[in-house]
């Protein structure tokens, strides 16, 4: 079957033809490891896991290489490390934060049924490649040194002759539109407002490496150069698919294209650019100020959303019910619907032998049309085709055996019930003791009232 994918650059759906069918290559921007991943972060992880599975099905497992990076150098990481480990040297504190957060991320996405990428490179392990690209850009006249910074010049890129794309092509915006439509940091070391940082000097105590381009002061990379370096190292100068959230189109992916194409004198960095849409929660933008910010871990292990925890397979199916390019509204009702479907499918097909279903494959090869694929799964269930249903679930990455909620959920509920009884008996000492016990488990209690004015206690994992 012919695979057709929507390309953000060309703004149309077209046949996917890999550069080398024996070596299909995909890069997806991964997490910055400073905190628990939120449910919006889960969307690209799940979407491109489905694409990874489909590519492996079409071209063979040995012929698909999926790279998803780990960003382990960032101001947010530095801030978190200084806050959480004030008594440690910053570099040691950073290592603790990044290693712990990376483990948490893997635990969460494993629970969502996602395969591990072929390669998961860390930014700090690719400083040499970043320096090399920066040196190429400076030598080619696309970047310049100013006040111990190295900056890329989009104007220089657009003035160059040859095969290079126009800066702004991916976002479909001109330089003037980018300035008008975005907050652009006009620092004194910039020649033009649209210039962006490739390398910057480190502050005392911050992570630092020898700088490129003859700069004597140690420094660290800018955000965008990291992905250009890691994709080059593991996939080459040009590869098949680059994916991520739609929020990354500009500036991150636009700047990746600029860096890579100018460094290697290529027309394209990736043959196909894919971006998933935004996520909102119960009709509102997710934000901490609205109180609807929720992590994957909280969905899996607390009662913060819908008064209960949810199985990873349920979260996965709920995410896939909306086409990846469309905005998704994350609701409790959608999770209940997904759970009902999985329970029904699992009971029906858990002992079946997986076989291929062409209608299901056809839906996925049409730009990952997961809503249509899910409709086909329902049709298989109605038709009593257990083997095909089991095969489709397997391809979609949904385990037919629904896991029970994690033990922490039951433990917390039991303790909360005991505390509620203690409070009813005005045994404040016991109530406080239980609160402290839960706090030691990393569980934060919130006392309040429901719509009827009845006292209720909810809980969430401490960050």
Swiss-Prot record:
<dbReference type="GO" id="GO:0004817">
    <property type="term" value="F:cysteine-tRNA ligase activity"/>
</dbReference>
<keyword id="KW-0963">Cytoplasm</keyword>
<feature type="binding site">
    <location>
        <position position="256"/>
    </location>
    <ligand>
        <name>Zn(2+)</name>
    </ligand>
</feature>
<keyword id="KW-0547">Nucleotide-binding</keyword>
<dbReference type="Pfam" id="PF23493">
    <property type="entry name" value="CysS_C"/>
</dbReference>
<protein>
    <recommendedName>
        <fullName>Cysteine--tRNA ligase</fullName>
        <ecNumber>6.1.1.16</ecNumber>
    </recommendedName>
</protein>
<feature type="short sequence motif" description="'KMSKS' region">
    <location>
        <begin position="285"/>
        <end position="289"/>
    </location>
</feature>
<dbReference type="InterPro" id="IPR015803">
    <property type="entry name" value="Cys-tRNA-ligase"/>
</dbReference>
<feature type="binding site">
    <location>
        <position position="29"/>
    </location>
    <ligand>
        <name>Zn(2+)</name>
    </ligand>
</feature>
<dbReference type="GO" id="GO:0008270">
    <property type="term" value="F:zinc ion binding"/>
</dbReference>
<keyword id="KW-0479">Metal-binding</keyword>
<feature type="binding site">
    <location>
        <position position="227"/>
    </location>
    <ligand>
        <name>Zn(2+)</name>
    </ligand>
</feature>
<dbReference type="GO" id="GO:0006423">
    <property type="term" value="P:cysteinyl-tRNA aminoacylation"/>
</dbReference>
<dbReference type="InterPro" id="IPR015273">
    <property type="entry name" value="Cys-tRNA-synt_Ia_DALR"/>
</dbReference>
<dbReference type="InterPro" id="IPR014729">
    <property type="entry name" value="Rossmann-like_a/b/a_fold"/>
</dbReference>
<comment type="similarity">
    <text>Belongs to the class-I aminoacyl-tRNA synthetase family.</text>
</comment>
<comment type="subunit">
    <text>Monomer.</text>
</comment>
<dbReference type="GO" id="GO:0005524">
    <property type="term" value="F:ATP binding"/>
</dbReference>
<keyword id="KW-0030">Aminoacyl-tRNA synthetase</keyword>
<dbReference type="InterPro" id="IPR024909">
    <property type="entry name" value="Cys-tRNA/MSH_ligase"/>
</dbReference>
<keyword id="KW-0862">Zinc</keyword>
<feature type="short sequence motif" description="'HIGH' region">
    <location>
        <begin position="31"/>
        <end position="41"/>
    </location>
</feature>
<dbReference type="InterPro" id="IPR056411">
    <property type="entry name" value="CysS_C"/>
</dbReference>
<keyword id="KW-0067">ATP-binding</keyword>
<dbReference type="Pfam" id="PF01406">
    <property type="entry name" value="tRNA-synt_1e"/>
</dbReference>
<dbReference type="InterPro" id="IPR009080">
    <property type="entry name" value="tRNAsynth_Ia_anticodon-bd"/>
</dbReference>
<keyword id="KW-0648">Protein biosynthesis</keyword>
<keyword id="KW-0436">Ligase</keyword>
<feature type="binding site">
    <location>
        <position position="252"/>
    </location>
    <ligand>
        <name>Zn(2+)</name>
    </ligand>
</feature>
<dbReference type="InterPro" id="IPR032678">
    <property type="entry name" value="tRNA-synt_1_cat_dom"/>
</dbReference>
<dbReference type="GO" id="GO:0005829">
    <property type="term" value="C:cytosol"/>
</dbReference>
<feature type="binding site">
    <location>
        <position position="288"/>
    </location>
    <ligand>
        <name>ATP</name>
    </ligand>
</feature>
């Amino acid at each position: 079957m012919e695979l057709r994918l929507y390309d953000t650059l060309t703004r149309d759906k077209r046949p996917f033809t890999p550069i080398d069918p024996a070596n299909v290559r995909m890069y997806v921007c991964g997490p910055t490891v400073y905190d628990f991943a939120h449910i919006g972060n889960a969307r690209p992880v799940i979407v491109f896991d489905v694409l990874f599975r489909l590519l492996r099905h079409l071209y063979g497992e040995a012929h698909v290489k999926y790279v998803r990076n780990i960003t382990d150098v960032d101001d947010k990481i530095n801030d978190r490390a200084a806050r959480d480990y004030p008594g440690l040297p910053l570099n040691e504190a950073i290592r603790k934060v990044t290693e712990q957060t990376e483990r948490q991320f893997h635990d969460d996405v494993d629970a969502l049924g996602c395969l591990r990428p072929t390669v998961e490179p860390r930014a700090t392990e690719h400083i040499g490649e970043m320096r090399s690209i920066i040196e190429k850009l400076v030598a080619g006249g696309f970047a310049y040194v100013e006040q111990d910074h190295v900056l890329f010049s989009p104007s220089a890129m657009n003035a160059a002759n040859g095969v290079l794309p126009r800066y702004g092509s991916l976002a479909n915006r001109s330089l003037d539109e980018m300035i008008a439509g975005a907050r652009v940091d006009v620092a004194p070391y910039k020649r033009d407002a649209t210039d962006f940082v490739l390398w910057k000097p480190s502050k005392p105590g911050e992570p630092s490496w020898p700088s490129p381009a003859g700069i004597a002061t140690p420094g660290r990379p800018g955000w965008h150069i990291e992905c250009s370096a890691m994709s080059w190292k593991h996939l080459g100068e040009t590869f098949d698919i680059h994916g991520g959230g739609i929020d990354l189109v500009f500036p991150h992916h636009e700047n990746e294209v600029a860096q890579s194409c100018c460094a290697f004198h290529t027309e394209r960095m990736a043959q196909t650019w894919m971006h998933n849409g935004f996520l909102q929660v119960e009709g509102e933008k997710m934000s901490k100020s609205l109180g609807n910010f929720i992590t994957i871990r909280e969905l899996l292990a607390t009662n913060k959303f819908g008064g209960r925890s949810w199985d990873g397979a349920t979260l996965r199916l709920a995410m896939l019910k909306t086409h990846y390019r469309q905005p998704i509204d994350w609701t409790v009702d959608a999770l209940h619907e997904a759970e009902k479907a999985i329970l029904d499918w699992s009971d029906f097909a858990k002992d079946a032998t997986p076989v291929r279903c062409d209608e299901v494959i056809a839906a996925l090869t049409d730009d990952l049309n997961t809503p249509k694929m899910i409709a086909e799964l329902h049709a298989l269930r109605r038709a009593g085709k257990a083997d095909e249903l089991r095969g489709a679930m397997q391809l979609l990455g949904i385990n037919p055996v629904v896991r029970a909620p994690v033990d922490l959920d039951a433990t917390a509920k039991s303790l909360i019930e005991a505390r509620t009884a203690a409070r009813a008996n005005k045994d404040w000492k016991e109530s406080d003791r239980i609160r402290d016990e839960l706090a030691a488990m990393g569980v934060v209690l919130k006392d309040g009232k429901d719509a009827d004015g009845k006292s209720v206690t909810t809980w969430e994992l401490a960050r």
